[in-house]
């Protein structure tokens, strides 16, 4: 970790990605082991870099409102996180909850009085049947993608997010054709999430993104 810092000199340092899934997949015992490691790593790094924002991210899962144990476990880690760092993919969430998750988020984390960051996000802009798992269909549209980015970026402006990372800039249809025989089928889920389509044409959400970038910088 120290060598990585010395090489990259980052403005922010993420020491764990979507770590709440450790609780989901491994239960409290594995989570407690991770939490001890995270706490020690955070404290040691802070001794040398007291002004560097250090954090681990969590993901908003599909049934985010029913994951009370996972939420409570991550909240206990917040004294050792300098940001509330979230990754979120609304196309995995039921229609009635996909935008509501952005209202749920500050209700759970505002009390920590720490800056927010969206470390990974995008939304699906096309209807996507999984080619092998034919019972799985993700129902994306350009309008739903635009509505998501409008709500997300309005929240980011309101809460003064330190950054928002849109994970896919352009659809990767060509890449998928090259890797589809060897990659997990799940990887197709993000194929059509670009602000630009596979031909480089801007989707409506692109205008929302550019408008947010053109807002005056607030110190």
Language model segments and positions:
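Sec/Tat-exported extracytoplasmic proteins
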Residues: 4-8, 17, 23, 45, ...
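Acidic-and-aromatic substrate-binding clefts and catalytic sites of carbohydrate-active enzymes
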Residues: 21-24, 59-70, 89-101, 126, ...
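An active-site-proximal structural segment forming one wall of the substrate-binding cleft
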Residues: 1-15, 33-44, 48, 69-77, ...
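The substrate-binding groove and active-site-proximal loops of carbohydrate-active enzymes
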Residues: 19-32, 87-96, 136-143, 193-200
């Amino acid at each position: 970790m120290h060598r990585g810092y010395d090489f990259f000199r980052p403005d922010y340092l993420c020491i764990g990605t979507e770590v709440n899934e450790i609780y989901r997949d491994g239960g409290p015992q594995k989570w407690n082991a991770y939490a001890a490691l995270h706490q020690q790593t955070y404290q040691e790094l802070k001794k040398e870099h007291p002004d560097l924002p250090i954090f681990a991210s969590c993901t908003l899962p599909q049934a985010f409102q029913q994951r009370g144990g996972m939420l409570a476990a991550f909240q206990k880690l917040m004294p050792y996180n300098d940001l509330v760092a979230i990754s979120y993919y609304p196309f995995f969430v039921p229609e009635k909850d996909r935008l509501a998750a952005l209202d749920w988020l500050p209700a759970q984390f505002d009390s920590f009085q720490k800056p927010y960051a969206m470390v990974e996000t995008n939304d699906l802009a096309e209807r996507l049947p999984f080619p092998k798992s034919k019972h799985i269909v993700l129902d994306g549209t350009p309008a739903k993608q635009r509505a998501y980015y409008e709500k997300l970026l309005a929240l980011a402006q309101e809460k003064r997010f330190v950054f928002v990372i849109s994970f896919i800039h352009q659809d990767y249809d060509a890449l998928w054709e090259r890797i589809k025989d060897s990659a997990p089928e799940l990887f197709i889920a993000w194929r059509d999430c670009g602000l630009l389509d596979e031909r480089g044409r801007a989707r409506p959400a692109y205008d929302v993104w550019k408008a947010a970038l053109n807002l005056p910088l607030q110190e």
